[in-house]
Amino acid sequence: MIQVLLVIICLAVFPYQGSCIILESENVNDYEIVYPKKLTVLPTGAMNSPHPCCDPVTCKPKKGEHCISGPCCRNCKFINSGTICKKARGDDMNDYCTGTTPDCPRNPYKD
């Protein structure tokens, strides 16, 4: 299974306006960290379109939305508690969404 890394970078384009750019990559090393004032061309794979969950001024979830991205975030809302966010491999155990965060917390019953 190929996992896609979503990195959200908020750039201050103008004093009162920002933009949320999402970089998609299978490998974090595909992208370099750039300073917003020096960014002229987006890296390969970057999408410079408004993210439906992101307030472009604050680069936080829009009013009424819970999250922007993450394994437990879908359509700007937290995924229901108890939903598997990471399937077990081998002797491992499944990890589950909590319903209160976009992150996939480690199962507390794991060693």
From Swiss-Prot:
Keywords: Cell adhesion impairing toxin, Disulfide bond, Hemostasis impairing toxin, Platelet aggregation inhibiting toxin, Secreted, Signal, Toxin
Subcellular localization: Secreted
GO cellular component: extracellular region
Top-level division of the source organism's lineage: Eukaryota
Keyword Secreted (UniProt): yes
Disintegrin domain span: 47-111
One of the Pfam families matching this protein, by short name: Disintegrin
UniProt motif (Cell attachment site) ranges: 89-91
InterPro entries tied to this protein: Disintegrin_CS, Disintegrin_dom, Disintegrin_dom_sf
Record-level Gene Ontology MF annotations: toxin activity
Disulfide bridge map: 53-76, 67-73, 72-97, 85-104
Proregion positions: 21-47
Family recorded in the similarity comment: Belongs to the disintegrin family. Dimeric disintegrin subfamily.
Function: Inhibits ADP-induced platelet aggregation in human platelet-rich plasma (IC(50) is 6 uM).
Quaternary structure, from the entry: Heterodimer; disulfide-linked.
Name of the featured protein: Disintegrin DS-AC
Organism: Atheris chlorechis (Western bush viper)
